[in-house]
Amino acid sequence: MNRVNPKALLISLAVMLALDTLGGMILTIFFASQSVRENTTPEQTRAAVEALNQSSGFLLSALAYGTFTTILGGYLAARLAKRLPYFNAGALGLAGVAIGIFLSGSSPLWFDIVGFFVTLPAALYGGHLSKRDVPPNA
């Protein structure tokens, strides 16, 4: 018996990654706009964006937003699966950690560690929230 609903996992993972990408772009534009001006060279722009990866404000904002999208992804995985909400939300969290390990790179170590330790609990919390929204006789 398969406990993880693959369709629910893939859809919720795609939504979570799309929201993460969009949010990352918005955060980058917001934070970079403070240091990049109209007549900035491409090298200066690249340096400003690389400096963002070391900026505490940017990184904390990215962690908060990523945690929100992970909660949303866990909620969505659990709702779409229609059964075993914690198991399906947890599978999403583990997939998120695996992707995070694969994509980690230029950010500080503390950022990666906090992100990895927050991902699974955030996804499980999303699964918990989905349980609250389902009537007991469903």
Language-model features: locations:
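Juxtamembrane/disordered regions of integral membrane proteins
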Residues: 1-138
